[in-house]
Amino acid sequence: MASWWRAFPQAARRYPWPTNVLLYAGLFSAGDALQQRLRGGPADWRQTRRVATLAVTFHGNFNYVWLRLLERALPGRAPRTVLAKVLCDQTVGGPIALSAFYVGMSVLQGKDDIFLDLKQKFWNTYKSGLMYWPFVQLTNFSLVPVHWRTAYTGLCAFLWATFLCFSQQSGDGTLQSIFIFLRRKEASDKSPEK
């Protein structure tokens, strides 16, 4: 195990794209598994495979290319540059990734109207993301080396994916919906068995 752990940073430097994409996809998929666990009931591995498919084919790759593009367009870690990167990420990258998630999941689930979830949940989810992602990316752009940025985003996306997958399955894209669900679940777990 120790040798694997030491080899991982070398792989990220030598093969940054596949290493970052696979790590991102694994963490994003784990977020879906966590939200299923929180909801209770049997695990839906087909759903987790769909999330993993979308994370590997789009999200991990998009984030890898997008973060490198931002670094090329706005190089450095000066405060103004970092703020410009965060602004670009939240006004361009965020909406693209969020739209791809809702539409991609609808396609993979075989829904008739692949844009319905996007239409119903985009704005609420985007606003919820604005309470999380600017702070994540502020840290990312100012402290994390370029070759680790997608992996760091994936680590932070673990929490986001938990929320996002819940919203796609049964929420409305607001943080309030998940808190209400968790409160109800806690109350039902505490109620005496009949």
Swiss-Prot record:
Gene Ontology process terms (BP): negative regulation of hydrogen peroxide biosynthetic process; negative regulation of mitochondrial outer membrane permeabilization involved in apoptotic signaling pathway; reactive oxygen species metabolic process
**Membrane spanning segments where?**
15-34, 51-67, 92-110, 151-168
Q: Key word Membrane present in the record?
A: yes
Per the UniProt entry, what species is this protein from, by scientific name?
A: Mus musculus (Mouse)
Region described as Targeting to peroxisomes: spans on this chain:
16-55
Specify the domain of life of the species encoding this protein: Eukaryota
Q: Report what the protein is called.
A: Mpv17-like protein
Task: Choose one Gene Ontology CC annotation of this protein and give it.
Answer: mitochondrion
Q: Which InterPro entries match?
A: Mpv17_PMP22
Residues on the membrane's Cytoplasmic side span 1-14, 68-91, 169-194
The UniProt entry, under Pfam families, shows: Mpv17_PMP22
Tissue expression notes: Isoform 1 and isoform 3 are expressed in the kidney (at protein level). Isoform 1 is expressed in the kidney, spleen, heart, brain, lung and liver. Isoform 3 is expressed in the kidney. Isoform 1 and isoform 3 expression increase during development, reache their highest level in adulthood and decrease with aging.
Q: Which family does it belong to?
A: Belongs to the peroxisomal membrane protein PXMP2/4 family.
Q: Which residues lie on this side of the membrane: Lumenal?
A: 35-50, 111-150
Which keywords describe this protein according to UniProt? Cytoplasm, Membrane, Peroxisome, Transmembrane, Transmembrane helix
